Amino acid sequence: MGTQDPGNMGTGVPASEQISCAKEDPQVYCPEETGGTKDVQVTDCKSPEDSRPPKETDCCNPEDSGQLMVSYEGKAMGYQVPPFGWRICLAHEFTEKRKPFQANNVSLSNMIKHIGMGLRYLQWWYRKTHVEKKTPFIDMINSVPLRQIYGCPLGGIGGGTITRGWRGQFCRWQLNPGMYQHRTVIADQFTVCLRREGQTVYQQVLSLERPSVLRSWNWGLCGYFAFYHALYPRAWTVYQLPGQNVTLTCRQITPILPHDYQDSSLPVGVFVWDVENEGDEALDVSIMFSMRNGLGGGDDAPGGLWNEPFCLERSGETVRGLLLHHPTLPNPYTMAVAARVTAATTVTHITAFDPDSTGQQVWQDLLQDGQLDSPTGQSTPTQKGVGIAGAVCVSSKLRPRGQCRLEFSLAWDMPRIMFGAKGQVHYRRYTRFFGQDGDAAPALSHYALCRYAEWEERISAWQSPVLDDRSLPAWYKSALFNELYFLADGGTVWLEVLEDSLPEELGRNMCHLRPTLRDYGRFGYLEGQEYRMYNTYDVHFYASFALIMLWPKLELSLQYDMALATLREDLTRRRYLMSGVMAPVKRRNVIPHDIGDPDDEPWLRVNAYLIHDTADWKDLNLKFVLQVYRDYYLTGDQNFLKDMWPVCLAVMESEMKFDKDHDGLIENGGYADQTYDGWVTTGPSAYCGGLWLAAVAVMVQMAALCGAQDIQDKFSSILSRGQEAYERLLWNGRYYNYDSSSRPQSRSVMSDQCAGQWFLKACGLGEGDTEVFPTQHVVRALQTIFELNVQAFAGGAMGAVNGMQPHGVPDKSSVQSDEVWVGVVYGLAATMIQEGLTWEGFQTAEGCYRTVWERLGLAFQTPEAYCQQRVFRSLAYMRPLSIWAMQLALQQQQHKKASWPKVKQGTGLRTGPMFGPKEAMANLSPE
C-alpha cells in the first residue's frame, strides 16, 4: 500500500548447438547478405515442456532460489554475482495470478456496513476525475493491475526513479514527483553485437519482447539461458549466449549509501557490462544502449523534443553520450545516456531515430561494423506526436579466454519541480551539488561513471556484516536489503528548503528546526504508489526504522516537518467519506495523517486523506511521542529532544480527552479510529491502549530528561492507573483481547497487539524498572499469536493474519481483519526477537517474504496487504520497511550480551553509555 526471457541464441551457431529455428517467425529480422557480415542466423527457444524436462541446476543460489530458478538451462554463474539476494530465471512464469482488492471482494455484511461510504466515494471520485480533472489520492475504481515484472529501481533518494524489470525492460517511471507511469518503453534496450575476423556473427536485443515496432531488430531472447539477481541497490543480469562461448554480466548500480546525504540524492544509475570470452577465438564485442526521449504516447504529444551528443573530459577521464532534451512543462528535464571512454573502448552514437518505425537504419548501422555512425550536431525538434530516440554504443576487443568491461550511465536532470497544484517551485536536493540550471546531466554522468567503484566499496562494507552472518537465513538477507527499494521508489522527494519558506511564529520554539531543514533538506515518501499521500504518519511509525537506522538526519527532518504541521490548523470544512460528517481539514495540536498529495501542494496543504477525520484517531499522537523518543535514543541528539518536548506535551494533552472515565487508559470511539481504518474498535483496546501506555511511559522518561518533575509525576500516576486498567479489562490469560466491547469479535487475537511493547523495547525500555506490560504476558501473547495467527493460518506459510478468532478461524468481521499486512508482520517478528522468540520471529516473517517475492511475483512492489486467496491490496507500500526493526532487534540482542546499560533504581533512566547509532549499528554502517 516483479519480467521476461533472454533469447535468440544468435548468429552463426552450429546447427548441432541450436535449440530450434525461428526463421518463419515474421517478427524476427533475419538479414542475409549485408556488407561486412556473415549470414546472421536467428534461433529461438521453446518452453521446457516442449523440448526438455525442467530440472534443478546447481547454479541457483544454493540456499534460497527455489522454484524461481528451475527453468534456468545455462551453466554460467556470471561475473562476481553474490550468493545472496533475489534470483530468478528470465524464463520463469508465476503460476498464481492475483487481482487487486475491489468492491466485489467485500462480503455482503461488510458491504452493507460501508454502503454510505461507497456512495459518497463514488460521488467524490466522479467530481475529482471528471470535473477537476485530477487523480484521486486513492483510486478504488482503477487499481494498478498485477504485473509480475519489476526489479531494482534506478536513481538515488528524492530525484525520481526509473524501475528496470527483471527481464530488462524499463517499465515504471517516477520522474514527476510522486506520480507514477507504468509503461514499458520498447526502444529502451541493450543490444549485443559480436564480430569475429571482421564479420558480425551475432546481434541480439537482450529482451524477451517481440514488439510490433522496431521489427527489423532481432528480438525474442531465450530466457532459459539468463537470470536476474537483485540485492538492492545493485542488481545483476547474466546472459549465457549459447553457441558463442560468451557470457555477459550486466551489473546495475544506484548510489544508495547509508549516512550519505550527497551522493545518495543523485538521479543516476550505472550499468557495468563484464564480457567473458570462453572460446579460443578473439572477438570484438559491442553493447548498444538505446533510449527513447520520454515514454511515448501522450508524452510525445507536445513535440519539441530533441537530442544532441556530448563529450565531457575532467581530471583525465572522458565520458561521451547523448542528451535527450524533454522540455515539456511544468517539469522539463534532460536525460543523459553516456559511456566511459577508456584506452580499450570506443564510444559511438546515433543522435536520433524513430522509435515507432522498423528501426532498420540503426540495426544495419550496428550490424555493419559493430559501431554507430556518430553524426555531429543536434537533432531537429520533433513535431507534435512524433517520437525520437537515440543510442550509445561501446565497443572493445576481447582476447581468447579474455574478459573486458564496458561502462554506461543513465542520468536525468529535473532540478526544478512543481507539484500538481503548480503553486510553488521546489528544488531537488542534488541541485545543492550540481546546480539548478538544468544543464547538469553531463556532469552527473561523468561523476557517476568515475565514482561508482567507490559506491560499490561502500555498499559492500555496509552489507557484508549481514551477508556474512551465517546465523541469518538467506531469505532474510534478500528481504532486508531489497525492501529498501521503497525509500527511493516511494514517490520520494528530497527538497532544498528556502530560508524564507519557514514560518517564524511556528518554529520559534524549535531552535534547531531551521538548521536541520537547511542542512539536510525536506524528505517525503508516499504511503504507497497507489495511496498517494506523503509521510502518512500512522504507517511511517512502522517504516521509520529504515530511515532512523540508515539516514537518521532525514528522519529528524521529517519529524520537524511533522511538528510544524501539528502546530498549524486549517479550519476549512469538508465532508469525510466514511461518516459523511463535515469537519475541519486540520486541527491544531494533533498530528496530521499525512503531509499532503503530490497532485496538490504537499506541506502547504496537509491531510489529503479524507476517509476519516483523523483528528479523532487514537494512534497518531501516540506514535509521534514514541518515535520522538526512539529517534532521540538512537541518535543521542539532545537538541532534537528539547525541540520536540513541547510538541509532545501538546499532543498528549490533546489525547487526554479520549480517557473519558479517567482510569488512565484511553478508549476507542466505536469506529475505525486508527491505522486499521476499516476495522472498528470500541472502548479500551489492545492496540491503541498498548500504544497509549507506551507513550505515557516514554513521557515519564522525557520529563525526567528535561527536568520537568511535575510532569514526570503526572504521567507516572497515569501510567500506574492505566496499567491496572489495561490488564484488568483486556488480559484473558492467553493474550490481550482486541477490545473491551460486547461484540463477539472483541476476543479476536490481533497480531499487532504488542505494538507498544515493540517500541518500548526498541527504546531500551519495557523491562526491569521500566516494565509496562508484564513480561510473562507479552511472551504468552506472542506465543498465542504464533500458534493461531501464524501456524493456524494458511499452514503457517503466509505470515500472520491480522485477526484470528480464539478457535482458529480468521476474523472476517471487517475488510481488514482477515488480511495479512506485511509491514505489521515484520514488526511482529521484531517483537518476537526482542522477547527471545527468535525462531518464531523468523518463521513468521519468512511466510510473508516467500509469499510476496517467490509465490505472488510482487518483487519490488510489496503490497500493504494480501488475503489467504485471490487478492492483494495497495502495491508498493511503505509499511514493509519495518523489516529494519528486525535488524535493530537483532543488533540490540547482540549489544545486550556485550554491555547491558545500567539503570538507576526507581527512575528507569539509563546512566550507562548511550546505545546510539555508533554502537547500535556498528555492524551495518562503515561510519
Swiss-Prot record:
Function text: Non-lysosomal glucosylceramidase that catalyzes the hydrolysis of glucosylceramides/GlcCers (such as beta-D-glucosyl-(1<->1')-N-acylsphing-4-enine) to free glucose and ceramides (such as N-acylsphing-4-enine). GlcCers are membrane glycosphingolipids that have a wide intracellular distribution. They are the main precursors of more complex glycosphingolipids that play a role in cellular growth, differentiation, adhesion, signaling, cytoskeletal dynamics and membrane properties.
Upper classification of the organism: Eukaryota, Metazoa, Chordata, Craniata, Vertebrata
A molecular function GO annotation: galactosylceramidase activity
Highest taxon in the source lineage: Eukaryota
Keyword annotations: Cholesterol metabolism, Disease variant, Endoplasmic reticulum, Glycosidase, Glycosyltransferase, Golgi apparatus, Hereditary spastic paraplegia, Hydrolase, Lipid metabolism, Membrane, Neurodegeneration, Sphingolipid metabolism, Steroid metabolism, Sterol metabolism, Transferase
Entry-linked Pfam families: DUF608, Glyco_hydr_116N
Entry's Gene Ontology BP terms: bile acid metabolic process; carbohydrate metabolic process; central nervous system development; central nervous system neuron development; cholesterol metabolic process; glucosylceramide catabolic process; glycoside catabolic process; glycosphingolipid catabolic process
Family listed: Belongs to the non-lysosomal glucosylceramidase family.
Identification of the protein by name: Non-lysosomal glucosylceramidase
Region Disordered: start-end pairs: 32-62
